[in-house]
Amino acid sequence: MAIDENKQKALAAALGQIEKQFGKGSIMRLGEDRSMDVETISTGSLSLDIALGAGGLPMGRIVEIYGPESSGKTTLTLQVIAAAQREGKTCAFIDAEHALDPIYAKKLGVDIDNLLCSQPDTGEQALEICDALTRSGAVDVIIVDSVAALTPKAEIEGEIGDSHMGLAARMMSQAMRKLAGNLKNANTLLIFINQIRMKIGVMFGNPETTTGGNALKFYASVRLDIRRIGAVKEGDVVVGSETRVKVVKNKIAAPFKQAEFQILYGEGININGELVDLGVKHKLIEKAGAWYSYNGDKIGQGKANASNYLKENPAVAAELDKKLREMLLNGGNGEQPVATAAFADEADETSEEF
């Protein structure tokens, strides 16, 4: 419907005044908002990137990853850091649990020499550090491990047994209000790792809940529920975990999708195993009996051997990864995905060796 000419002039003057006072981009028409094409960072898992719909976790947003103990929460966030660092981004890890293992992080591909790390004494200190890093505009990814370990100062200074009802929830609620706008302006991804607790007296429905109150649930653009659903074995030896991630909330694409992948001990997410499974599913890899073939060439007998072939031939893995992303991700813009870039780097290194 056409707007009256006088109203158009008044609106244009108002928009000009708002932009002059608060800066360009402070108000715009939704259809012109370029930020709708959200920049993402790969999770390190191709199937999870596809389940998220946008190719990874969104920049400038808050993400919550929660699940039981030893389900792969920290491993997943370290894979995100490794993917971000390969793109030249600056990352920070707020280790409230004081449990980060730098040797394990290095095995997953994290550049620990350039990873900012803080082990705060109180929850308020941790969140103030997050805010300071965000406002600097120089940090691209911040991980907080974990919400449950963000202990309010009053609780630390008090005695064991003292009642501190709702302190952590109030602290998180205030922090979310302060951080959300700054993260958008700085285009910084903030990931909170969270733990699960049981609600007492729940007869029907799911008794599980996350710590830190409800504010994080509302402010998070993406919430991921990660679970260990089985073991990966070589003979009788357990070498990893079968993992399922459910996208419980998603503001950038359709929610409730699931991804399943393997986390191998000391190696992280088995991306080559994912490429084999997805390649077979979408008919890019042929499977005849136990043999796997790609482009007419046999690449291995059994999934493990096919995965090893892709590991030893990163150029082939990069090509397969690119084809799968172009086929399965919506709104492809022709740019090289993060994971493909990582494979390409390995391919370059391999060609230099020979």
UniProtKB/Swiss-Prot annotation:
The protein's location, in the record's own words, is: Cytoplasm
- Primary location: cytoplasm
- List, alphabetically, the SUPFAM superfamilies matched: P-loop containing nucleoside triphosphate hydrolases (SSF52540), RecA protein, C-terminal domain (SSF54752)
For biological process, the GO terms are: DNA recombination; DNA repair; SOS response
Molecular-function annotations in GO: ATP binding; ATP hydrolysis activity; ATP-dependent DNA damage sensor activity; damaged DNA binding; single-stranded DNA binding
Briefly, what is this protein's role? Can catalyze the hydrolysis of ATP in the presence of single-stranded DNA, the ATP-dependent uptake of single-stranded DNA by duplex DNA, and the ATP-dependent hybridization of homologous single-stranded DNAs. It interacts with LexA causing its activation and leading to its autocatalytic cleavage.
Which family is this protein grouped under? Answer: Belongs to the RecA family.
Name-wise, this protein is Protein RecA
The scientific name of the source species is Yersinia enterocolitica serotype O:8 / biotype 1B (strain NCTC 13174 / 8081)
Gene this chain is encoded by? recA
